[in-house]
Regions:
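Surface-exposed amphipathic alpha-helices with a cationic face
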Residues: 84-92, 147-148, 152-159, 179
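Acidic, Mg2+-coordinating phosphoryl-transfer loop and its flanking beta/alpha structural elements
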Residues: 101-102, 162-208
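Active-site neighborhood of HAD-like aspartate-dependent phosphohydrolases
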Residues: 1-49, 53
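Short, acidic loop-to-helix structural element flanking the phosphoryl-transfer center
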Residues: 68-105
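Short, charged, surface-exposed secondary-structure boundary motifs
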Residues: 128-135, 194-204, 216-219
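Substrate-recognition "cap/lid" segment bordering the active-site pocket of phosphatases
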Residues: 109-165
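Short acidic-hydrophobic, aromatic-tinged amphipathic segments that line or gate anion-handling sites
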Residues: 120-121, 204-213
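Glycine-rich phosphate-binding "P-loop"
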Residues: 63-77, 134-142
């Protein structure tokens, strides 16, 4: 199998963390309230601006929505035990690596630093004030389309084509990467969901874990 780059999702792929809800929990805020805000936004009961204001308010209410505290949270989150060795083995073979996540830019940067990956893209940009307090964020609702745009930026920056790459992920927002590369490796989540039919159909391979990905791309 010939390829020049591998594009990884983060949540549920390189890490067991579900970053949005786990971040809320780590701050000490109500996960139930977070889920209600997201539900109301998804069902269009509230606008994007209203959902953002409510979620930022929820996080700020803990008194812990501050850059240094958030960085400690992200530093402490676990990686899949296979991830460091997998990334190391790809780097030794001069395979380029890119992280594209629907999560936060601060978290994506942290994972990139821990794994030694310089190319990373995130769907959510945190906005801090001069004192490091989290004030807002920018978020793109259509994560699959946004991931594809970010993938295209990576290709341009790396002088690659989509078919030079493998894509590894575990959720619906990876579907456009699977379609673009034609070689999407789908990691089955621990708990089944009702929104995975499309991504399963688009996948080139289905695997139970990151360890199985390691076996495929480093035979």
């Amino acid at each position: 199998m010939t390829y020049k780059a591998v594009v990884f999702d983060i949540d549920g792929t390189l890490s067991p963390v579900l970053s949005w809800l786990d971040f809320t929990k780590a701050l000490g805020a109500s996960v139930d309230r977070h889920q209600q805000i997201f539900h109301d936004y998804r069902e269009e009961h509230i606008t994007y601006e209203q959902s953002r204001e409510q979620l930022i308010g929820l996080w700020q209410s803990t008194g812990r929505a501050e850059h240094s505290i958030m960085q400690k949270i992200f530093d402490a989150w676990p990686l899949d035990p296979v991830a460091p060795e997998l990334i190391k083995s790809l780097r030794e073979r001069h395979i380029q690596i890119c992280l594209i996540t629907g999560s936060f830019d601060t978290y994506a940067a942290t994972v990139g630093r821990r794994l030694g990956v310089k190319h990373w893209y995130a769907n959510t940009e945190f906005i801090f004030d001069e004192a490091g307090q989290l004030m807002s964020y920018n978020y793109v609702r259509d994560q699959a389309a946004e991931k594809l745009k970010q993938f295209q930026k990576f290709l341009a920056a790396s002088s690659l084509t989509a078919t030079d790459c493998l894509a590894v992920g575990d959720g619906p927002n990876d579907i456009e990467l699977f379609k673009a590369t034609g070689r999407g490796i789908f990691i089955e989540p621990a708990f089944d969901r009702d929104d995975l039919a499309g991504i399963r159909a688009a996948a080139w391979r289905h695997v139970p874990s990151l360890a199985a990905v390691h076996a495929i791309i480093n035979p």
